[in-house]
From Swiss-Prot:
InterPro entries: Znf-C2H2_11, Znf_C2H2_sf, Znf_C2H2_type
Family recorded in the similarity comment: Belongs to the krueppel C2H2-type zinc-finger protein family.
Taxonomic lineage of the native organism: Eukaryota, Metazoa, Chordata, Craniata, Vertebrata
Keyword terms: DNA-binding, Metal-binding, Nucleus, Repeat, Transcription, Transcription regulation, Zinc, Zinc-finger
Major location category of this protein: nucleus
Protein name as annotated: Gastrula zinc finger protein XlCGF42.1
Any Gene Ontology biological process: regulation of transcription by RNA polymerase II
PROSITE patterns according to UniProt: ZINC_FINGER_C2H2_1, ZINC_FINGER_C2H2_2
Amino acid sequence: TGEKPYSCSDCGKCFTRRWNLSEHRKSHTGQKRFCCSVCGKGFSYHSQMKSHYRTHTGEKPCICSECGKSFTDHAGLRIHQKYHTGVKPFSCSECGKCFTRRSGLTAHLRIHTGEKPYTCTECGKCFTCRTDLARHLRIHTENKPFTCSQCEKSFASHSDLDRHHCLP
């Protein structure tokens, strides 16, 4: 029926099964039970770690039948496919901008509130989202976990690797 009666009291995400909610709740504990063997990044779920690991290998086995774009996991593909349908169920009450994902709306709302809840412990710079802080932290650590398979040059972010054009 599509009904999702089980909702997370921390973030509001809803689930069809109690077990899925129980598994999801583990993500709020902060415990990272699975670590990437390449860069050491921790994850709450094995599936997250496996998907992340593919960013190092470049493997993107999930392919969109509409446009051919590929993804490291099925979740990324499902989110992408919403762009083809044009469905954006999450809208900003301030400006009306709509989003495919709830997390997109949550991050967007911080533009209006000015909230920057993620702070760098090295320099004090603040960020609106966790991924921006994680990318920034690599400046301090010189961690460059994304390596070109052609020339072995390393990059601090996956987007920097994608922009890199190596001629074999």
